From Swiss-Prot:
Residues 1-21 form the signal peptide. SUPFAM superfamilies: Prokaryotic lipoproteins and lipoprotein localization factors. One of its GO terms (cellular component) is outer membrane-bounded periplasmic space. The lineage of its organism: Bacteria, Pseudomonadati, Pseudomonadota, Gammaproteobacteria, Enterobacterales. Monomer. Belongs to the LolA family. The gene is lolA. It is found in: Periplasm. This is Outer-membrane lipoprotein carrier protein. It comes from Cronobacter sakazakii (strain ATCC BAA-894) (Enterobacter sakazakii). Residues 169-204 are annotated as: Disordered.
Length: 204
């Protein structure tokens, strides 16, 4: 009887891992259908009690695997750009920019996961699928991300995604007007404007 129980437990664990693997494969396959796109987005941030913290909007350009431009226009302008090697963050209001190597940037943030879409990243999560919804829970609890949810259609269109941090703060993003196709490569380059203070972490 004990042997049967152990066998059943092993089979159950295998079945769960297969479901997670299938969900990860389906998610990657869907995102792979669109190699580059532009979309506008709205953002809503709530705290652990559900109270609104911030609302915003902006535009997003992606060319996988490592080119992206995340341009927040409201409430305050900020820009996050990857040229494939360097990750730039620019805040026009305070006239400051920072530069880090993309390879050193954390890959466990929702946006980096979507932009990279690499199997090695998805393997770090337990993934459950319900139709077009994918719920990701980190296998390691060491990071700040508690849960990540993304809704992506079979044709690769991302409708929305949200992230819950360990303190239960939730950031939700609704994408709209996604346009698939070639993106102007100038969107993925950044030259600090004159007078901007640059914190270059690449040589430290």
């Amino acid at each position: 009887m004990k042997k049967i129980a152990v066998t059943c437990a092993l089979l159950s664990a295998f079945a769960v891992s297969s479901v997670w693997a299938d969900a990860a494969g389906d998610l990657k396959s869907r995102l792979d259908k669109v190699s580059s796109f532009h979309a506008s987005f709205t953002q809503k941030v709530t705290d652990g009690s559900g109270a609104a913290v911030q609302e915003g909007q902006g535009d997003l350009w992606v060319k996988r695997p490592n080119l992206f431009n995340w341009h927040m226009t409201q409430p305050d302008e900020s820009v996050l750009i990857s040229d494939g090697k360097t990750l730039w963050f620019y805040n026009p209001f305070v006239e400051q920019a920072s530069a880090t190597w993309l390879k050193d940037a954390t890959s466990n943030t929702p946006f980096m996961l979507i932009a990279r879409n690499q199997s090695s990243d998805w393997q770090q999560y337990n993934i459950k699928q319900n139709g077009d919804d994918f719920v990701l829970t980190p296998k390691s609890a060491s990071g700040n991300l508690k849960q990540f949810t993304i809704n992506v259609s079979r044709d690769g269109t991302i409708n929305q995604f949200s992230a819950v941090e360990q303190d239960d703060q939730r950031s939700s993003y609704q994408l709209k007007s996604q346009q698939n196709g070639a993106v102007d490569m100038s969107k993925f380059t950044f030259t600090p404007p004159q007078g901007v203070t640059v914190d270059d972490q690449r040589n430290k």
